[in-house]
């Protein structure tokens, strides 16, 4: 199959599974129908495969996974040969993946990959099977699964990420020479593209992790001397920062300071802020950011001040960080709902909200309650407080976890050596999450510039 056909199918699947938002009205209708579509023993009555898939997808889109699986199981039981079985298998596996039950997810993802290898669901199943193995710490096995993807689907939708995942999986397995070999394979296959740059950035990260400062500097220079940043998940500022960090660790302080100083200082670059901090610690005073513009000041208001101060004070969370997340998540719109069924000011998904509702004082929480500002802020504050404890107060890791999941953030932090903010940010493995971290931390930097911890204007 040609890559264009792959892409068309890929877009269709995610239009169908991830981005076709089921409205709250549709969810209520399906929930009501299911109450009356049951046999005497409480089991779902047999419906058409299409109807089971529709209802299951509606629950899936709203992250009500146990309810979605009831319908997917009925498809597998009643219609095992129907084309809907592939979707039922894949979404069942994905639901367990979202619930972090990776061992159970593998059962369904492996099955859809084996039984439907010529479909998009099969290809996606194989890819997510590898991801599950990574999250279980089975990195060598994950590398083999990703390599299988490269052999079976050389033009697959995830062929670039499969190569990059092999590099990181081999690195995490301690197979450094094999990881470096895959850096070269990736560079050859994707020469002149952002994927080649990502492979080189992975090499920089690996060398920093291993304390090979000279090799980290050399890899960074290879990128800076002509790599393509378009389509990559890194930037000139990030690579300069990593190079400066390697130089500093190697004892080349003046060259390190010169490299940090070459990063333009403004409030829109995450790494410029880190560079300023490192320069300031060394006594340098030439890296002062430009004053905030009138638009930057007006775009960062204090909203819901009383509620934020009430619930952040309890857990010693910086209220400016809550505002930074709120701005990014909903632009302060209390009625916001995402395609992934995240609701309200801080875009809570129902399964997360249910976990913290009792601690927050809302034991009878219903989905629509998350549109209430006080409820949303209270529950999100409980969640963020737990993340703060888990990640030792590293706000970059908290932001990454809020967007990309606790287990992913923990894995990125675990492979960050040293556990420094900029090193962690460079290790974030999802493009969306990495961009999210940068935006939240830039927001946080501006809020700290504008307001004190009581949210009074400076």
Show where each model-derived region lies:
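Catalytic glycan-binding domains that act on GlcNAc-containing polysaccharides
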Residues: 100, 124, 136, 141, ...
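Short solvent-exposed coil/turn linkers within tandem alpha-helical repeat scaffolds
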Residues: 42-47, 75-85, 113-123, 150-161, ...
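TPR-adjacent "capping" and linker segments in tetratricopeptide-repeat scaffold/adaptor proteins
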Residues: 35-51, 232-234, 292-301
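Alpha-helical segment of the N-proximal tetratricopeptide repeat
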Residues: 42-74, 78, 94, 98
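"A position-specific structural signal for the A-helix of alpha-solenoid helical repeats
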Residues: 54, 91, 128, 165, ...
């Amino acid at each position: 199959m040609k890559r264009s056909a792959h892409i068309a199918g890929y877009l269709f699947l995610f239009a169908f599974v991830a981005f076709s938002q089921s409205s709250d009205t549709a969810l209520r209708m399906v929930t009501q129908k299911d109450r009356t579509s049951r046999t005497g023993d409480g089991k779902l009555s047999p419906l058409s495969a299409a109807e089971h898939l529709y209802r299951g997808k509606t629950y899936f889109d709203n992250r009500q996974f146990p309810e979605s699986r009831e319908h997917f199981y009925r498809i597998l039981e009643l219609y095992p040969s129907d084309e809907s079985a592939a979707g039922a298998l894949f979404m069942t596996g994905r639901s367990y993946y979202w619930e972090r039950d990776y061992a159970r997810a593998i059962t369904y993802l492996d099955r859809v990959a084996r039984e439907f290898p010529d479909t998009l669901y099969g290809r996606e199943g194989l890819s997510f099977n590898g991801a599950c193995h990574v999250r279980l710490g089975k990195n060598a096995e994950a590398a083999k699964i990703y390599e299988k993807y490269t052999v079976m689907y050389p033009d697959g939708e995830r062929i670039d990420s499969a190569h990059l995942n092999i590099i990181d999986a081999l690195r995490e397995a301690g197979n450094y020479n094999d990881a470096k070999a895959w850096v070269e394979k990736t560079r050859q296959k994707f020469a002149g593209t952002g994927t080649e740059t990502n492979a080189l950035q992975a090499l920089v990260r690996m060398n920093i992790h291993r304390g090979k400062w000279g090799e980290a500097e050399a890899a960074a220079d290879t990128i800076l001397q002509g790599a393509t940043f378009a389509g990559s998940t890194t930037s000139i500022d990030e690579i300069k920062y990593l190079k400066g960090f390697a130089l500093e660790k190697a004892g080349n302080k003046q060259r390190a300071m010169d490299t940090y100083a070459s990063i333009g200082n403004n409030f829109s670059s995450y790494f410029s802020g880190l560079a300023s901090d490192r320069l300031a610690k060394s006594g340098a005073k030439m890296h002062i950011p430009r004053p905030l513009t009138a638009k930057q000041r007006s775009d960062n208001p204090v909203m819901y001040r009383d509620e934020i101060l009430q619930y952040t004070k309890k857990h010693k969370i910086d209220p400016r960080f809550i505002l930074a997340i709120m701005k990014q998540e909903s632009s302060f719109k209390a009625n916001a709902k995402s395609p992934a069924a995240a609701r309200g000011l801080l875009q809570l998904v129902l399964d997360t909200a249910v976990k913290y509702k009792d601690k927050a004082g809302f034991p009878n929480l219903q989905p629509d309650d998350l549109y209430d500002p006080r409820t949303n802020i209270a529950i999100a504050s409980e969640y963020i407080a737990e993340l703060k404890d888990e990640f030792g107060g590293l706000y970059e890791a908290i932001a990454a976890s809020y967007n990309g999941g606790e287990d992913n953030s923990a894995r990125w932090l675990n492979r960050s050596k040293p556990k420094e903010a900029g090193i962690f940010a460079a290790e974030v493995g999802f493009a969306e999450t990495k961009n999210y971290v940068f935006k939240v931390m830039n927001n946080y930097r501006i809020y700290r510039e504008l307001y004190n911890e009581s949210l009074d204007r400076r």
